[in-house]
Amino acid sequence: MDEEAKIRTCQLLDLPWEDVLIPHILCYLPLQHLVSLQRVSKQFHSLIQVYLTNCRTFDLTSIGPSIPKEAFCSMLKDNKVLHSLSLQNCSDWVTDKELLPVIGQNQHLQRVDMSGCVCLTRHSLVAVSLSCMHLQHLGLAHCEWVDSLSLRSLADHCGGLQSIDLTACRQLKDDAICYLAKKCLKLRSLSLAVNANITDESVEEVAKNCRGLEQLDLTGCLRVRNQSIRTLAEYCPKLQSLKVNHCHNVTESSLDPLRKRNVVIDVEPPLQRALVLLQDVLGFAPFINLQI
């Protein structure tokens, strides 16, 4: 009877933490639930801290705006094994002061997303480049603090980079992008969108050096022309997706060879666009065959 009573009174925290709770239960809970569990009791706080110390992925995308910066520092203060760190939606509070210690003690990071973190500075990117030699994926969209020197540091130290999002990094010009292309030959995905400084020079350098390129986003790169798109078609046989919306100097003459290779392009062919426009303006939907 005593044994049965013990079984009946067994509680969740009585299970082995590192053998059962962490690998088979906590790893499936969203971060916001883990944060809530920390407040239940001292034991739960200790359990969650053990989990956070050993977790490989830390994603603040869903709770970024609501988490205090002090909580962020506390949760990751002992973690030295992170492989992936996402700070999207943390723009209101994350600064170099909070991020630099985390980057400095996590040299195995392969994926870092700082997109939209407007309060960071170039020091954070330099820290990533110096600490994270195994970095493969980097998100810097809308980080206007990214400059040529910090990007060059990244290129010098993270040659294994496979994808980088530089959307709206408007300080960057052709010289920085060309340097990146010459150093990071394994790039498969690149966004240079919303940057009027980018010209054919950047696109051609990327095409000639990054032969395994699969995805390229040039949305809003107003100075890109047909010549660089033709170079892209010549040197990048693995290209799968190209975005050139609002690239007014890129025409169908350079896009057609890519379409014939089934590359997904975000602008319709001229005839298709004309038919859709006619359909919208005149309301002839039942009479127009858009498969012409």
From Swiss-Prot:
LRR repeats lie at residues 134-155, 160-181, 186-207, 212-233, 238-259. It is found in: Cytoplasm. Residues 12-59 form the F-box domain. GO terms for cellular component: cytoplasm; SCF ubiquitin ligase complex. The keyword Repeat applies. Keywords: Cytoplasm, Leucine-rich repeat, Repeat, Ubl conjugation pathway. The lineage of its organism: Eukaryota, Metazoa, Chordata, Craniata, Vertebrata. Substrate recognition component of a SCF (SKP1-CUL1-F-box protein) E3 ubiquitin-protein ligase complex which mediates the ubiquitination and subsequent proteasomal degradation of target proteins. Acts as a positive regulator of the BMP signaling pathway. Required for dorsal/ventral pattern formation. GO terms for biological process: bone mineralization; dorsal/ventral pattern formation; G2/M transition of mitotic cell cycle; positive regulation of BMP signaling pathway; protein ubiquitination; SCF-dependent proteasomal ubiquitin-dependent protein catabolic process. InterPro entries: F-box-like_dom_sf, F-box_dom, Leu-rich_rpt_Cys-con_subtyp, LRR_dom_sf. It comes from Dicentrarchus labrax (European seabass). Signal peptide: none annotated. This is F-box/LRR-repeat protein 15. Belongs to the FBXL15 family. PANTHER family: F-BOX_LRR-REPEAT PROTEIN 15, PARTNER OF PAIRED, ISOFORM B-RELATED. Pathway: Protein modification; protein ubiquitination. Part of the SCF (SKP1-CUL1-F-box) E3 ubiquitin-protein ligase complex SCF(FBXL15). The keyword Aminoacyl-tRNA synthetase does not apply.
